[in-house]
Amino acid sequence: MRYISTRGDKTERRFCEILLEGLAPDGGLYMPKAYPRVSGITMARWATLSYAELAYEILRLYIDDIPADDLRDIIGRTYTRDVFGTDEITPVRQIEEGLYVQALSNGPTLAFKDMAMQLLGNLFEYEL
Protein backbone atom coordinates (compact mmCIF):
# COMPACT_ATOMS: atom_id res chain seq x y z
CA MET A 1 0.00 0.00 0.00
CA ARG A 2 1.32 3.40 -0.96
CA TYR A 3 0.34 6.67 0.69
CA ILE A 4 0.33 10.21 -0.73
CA SER A 5 -0.32 13.68 0.70
CA THR A 6 -3.76 15.28 0.68
CA ARG A 7 -2.10 18.52 -0.46
CA GLY A 8 -0.84 17.20 -3.77
CA ASP A 9 2.70 15.97 -3.11
CA LYS A 10 2.77 12.81 -5.24
CA THR A 11 5.74 11.26 -3.43
CA GLU A 12 4.60 7.76 -2.50
CA ARG A 13 5.46 6.34 0.89
CA ARG A 14 4.79 3.08 2.66
CA PHE A 15 3.02 2.75 6.00
CA CYS A 16 6.14 2.33 8.13
CA GLU A 17 7.67 5.41 6.50
CA ILE A 18 4.72 7.62 7.44
CA LEU A 19 4.00 6.05 10.83
CA LEU A 20 6.59 8.13 12.67
CA GLU A 21 6.58 11.06 10.24
CA GLY A 22 3.25 12.65 11.14
CA LEU A 23 2.34 15.21 8.52
CA ALA A 24 3.57 15.03 4.94
CA PRO A 25 6.39 17.45 4.02
CA ASP A 26 3.85 19.76 2.31
CA GLY A 27 1.75 19.90 5.51
CA GLY A 28 -0.91 17.51 4.25
CA LEU A 29 -2.20 14.34 5.80
CA TYR A 30 -1.32 10.99 4.31
CA MET A 31 -3.99 8.97 2.55
CA PRO A 32 -3.89 5.74 0.57
CA LYS A 33 -3.08 6.24 -3.11
CA ALA A 34 -5.87 3.73 -3.85
CA TYR A 35 -8.42 2.05 -1.62
CA PRO A 36 -8.90 -1.71 -1.52
CA ARG A 37 -12.25 -3.16 -2.53
CA VAL A 38 -14.00 -5.48 -0.11
CA SER A 39 -16.69 -7.84 -1.37
CA GLY A 40 -20.00 -8.48 0.32
CA ILE A 41 -18.90 -12.07 0.91
CA THR A 42 -15.80 -10.85 2.73
CA MET A 43 -17.82 -8.40 4.81
CA ALA A 44 -20.24 -11.17 5.78
CA ARG A 45 -17.29 -13.29 6.91
CA TRP A 46 -15.89 -10.34 8.84
CA ALA A 47 -19.17 -10.00 10.74
CA THR A 48 -18.32 -13.22 12.60
CA LEU A 49 -14.87 -12.12 13.77
CA SER A 50 -13.72 -10.83 17.13
CA TYR A 51 -12.65 -7.19 17.37
CA ALA A 52 -8.95 -8.08 17.15
CA GLU A 53 -9.50 -10.45 14.23
CA LEU A 54 -11.52 -7.83 12.37
CA ALA A 55 -8.92 -5.15 13.06
CA TYR A 56 -6.25 -7.43 11.59
CA GLU A 57 -8.27 -8.20 8.46
CA ILE A 58 -8.89 -4.51 7.79
CA LEU A 59 -5.44 -3.22 8.73
CA ARG A 60 -3.61 -5.80 6.63
CA LEU A 61 -5.25 -4.20 3.58
CA TYR A 62 -3.51 -0.93 4.46
CA ILE A 63 -0.29 -2.14 6.09
CA ASP A 64 1.72 -4.44 3.85
CA ASP A 65 5.21 -3.60 5.07
CA ILE A 66 4.80 -5.20 8.49
CA PRO A 67 4.90 -9.00 8.22
CA ALA A 68 1.46 -10.58 8.71
CA ASP A 69 2.47 -12.52 11.83
CA ASP A 70 3.96 -9.40 13.42
CA LEU A 71 0.87 -7.33 12.61
CA ARG A 72 -1.41 -10.01 14.02
CA ASP A 73 0.70 -10.09 17.21
CA ILE A 74 0.65 -6.28 17.58
CA ILE A 75 -3.12 -6.20 17.20
CA GLY A 76 -3.55 -9.22 19.47
CA ARG A 77 -1.58 -7.47 22.23
CA THR A 78 -3.57 -4.27 21.75
CA TYR A 79 -7.20 -5.36 21.82
CA THR A 80 -7.42 -7.54 24.91
CA ARG A 81 -9.61 -7.94 27.98
CA ASP A 82 -6.68 -6.73 30.11
CA VAL A 83 -6.56 -3.42 28.22
CA PHE A 84 -10.27 -2.84 27.52
CA GLY A 85 -11.92 -4.68 30.40
CA THR A 86 -14.07 -6.93 28.20
CA ASP A 87 -13.56 -9.55 25.52
CA GLU A 88 -15.93 -7.59 23.27
CA ILE A 89 -13.58 -4.57 23.35
CA THR A 90 -16.39 -2.25 22.09
CA PRO A 91 -19.63 -3.85 23.25
CA VAL A 92 -22.86 -2.93 21.46
CA ARG A 93 -26.04 -2.87 23.52
CA GLN A 94 -29.61 -2.58 22.33
CA ILE A 95 -31.46 0.27 24.02
CA GLU A 96 -34.77 -0.37 22.28
CA GLU A 97 -35.99 -1.71 18.96
CA GLY A 98 -33.74 -0.24 16.27
CA LEU A 99 -31.60 1.74 18.73
CA TYR A 100 -28.15 0.57 19.79
CA VAL A 101 -25.26 2.13 21.67
CA GLN A 102 -21.62 1.15 21.36
CA ALA A 103 -19.24 1.57 24.29
CA LEU A 104 -16.03 3.23 23.12
CA SER A 105 -14.71 4.23 26.54
CA ASN A 106 -13.47 0.94 27.95
CA GLY A 107 -9.76 1.65 27.48
CA PRO A 108 -7.18 2.81 30.02
CA THR A 109 -8.11 6.51 29.79
CA LEU A 110 -11.85 5.83 29.49
CA ALA A 111 -11.99 7.78 26.21
CA PHE A 112 -12.76 6.76 22.64
CA LYS A 113 -9.21 7.71 21.62
CA ASP A 114 -7.96 4.55 23.34
CA MET A 115 -9.25 2.56 20.36
CA ALA A 116 -6.58 4.08 18.13
CA MET A 117 -3.92 5.21 20.58
CA GLN A 118 -3.37 1.80 22.16
CA LEU A 119 -2.66 0.39 18.70
CA LEU A 120 -0.54 3.37 17.70
CA GLY A 121 1.65 2.97 20.77
CA ASN A 122 2.26 -0.69 19.94
CA LEU A 123 3.00 0.17 16.30
CA PHE A 124 5.51 2.83 17.45
CA GLU A 125 7.16 0.31 19.76
CA TYR A 126 7.43 -2.19 16.90
CA GLU A 127 8.88 0.33 14.47
CA LEU A 128 11.33 1.91 16.91
Predicted features along the sequence, with ranges:
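PLP-dependent amino-acid enzyme catalytic core
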Residues: 1-128
